[in-house]
Regions:
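Cross-family detector of peptidyl-prolyl cis-trans isomerase
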Residues: 2-162
């Protein structure tokens, strides 16, 4: 009867593969067992509430009209969209009110698509609320601190048209 011998290197390789396989299976099981059973956090991009586009004139101005190709000066306040909040306003993210007005050329892609869509037609002195779905705001990528797939609410006051 012939005795089969295994070299120590082959035995170690077989043992190492078996051990690694067992450890991998154990780790996968532990990870599954320790998973978070709670619902996703409210800030998770997959659970953010989605808004439909809307624009509402809060105050109609009396000055020059905002048209594409013109440089505008505005004050704005930005909130996360929250359907339970007043006028869809959730957490305030940013404002220029009380600071330096924001200036941009309308209709050139210098701002998010929702502004290029929602600001034309405003008159100096006017205030408008824009509710923007993600594709008219910062999309899937977001723009920290704004998470991806966030719907946003802006209130914009038109200060100047050049």
């Amino acid at each position: 009867m012939k005795t089969r011998t295994t070299s120590p290197a082959i035995a170690l390789t077989t043992l190492t593969r078996t051990t690694l396989a067992v450890l991998l299976i154990a780790a996968m099981g532990a990870a599954a067992a320790c998973g978070d059973d709670s619902p996703s956090s409210p800030n998770s991009p997959t659970t953010l509430p989605r808004a439909e586009y809307s624009q509402t004139d809060l105050l109609v101005g009396t000055g020059s009209e905002a048209t594409n190709g013109r440089r505008l000066s505005v004050h704005y306040t930005l909130w996360m969209y929250d359907p339970a909040g007043s006028n869809g306003k959730g957490q305030q993210i940013q404002t220029s009110v009380g600071g330096t007005p924001f200036s941009f050329v309308l209709g050139t892609g210098a701002v998010i698509a929702g502004w290029d869509r929602g600001v034309p037609g405003m008159l100096i002195g006017g205030r408008r609320r824009l509710v923007l779905p993600p594709e008219l705001a910062y999309g899937a990528a977001g723009n920290p601190p704004i998470p991806g797939n966030a719907s946003l609410v802006f209130e914009i006051e038109l200060l100047g048209v050049q």
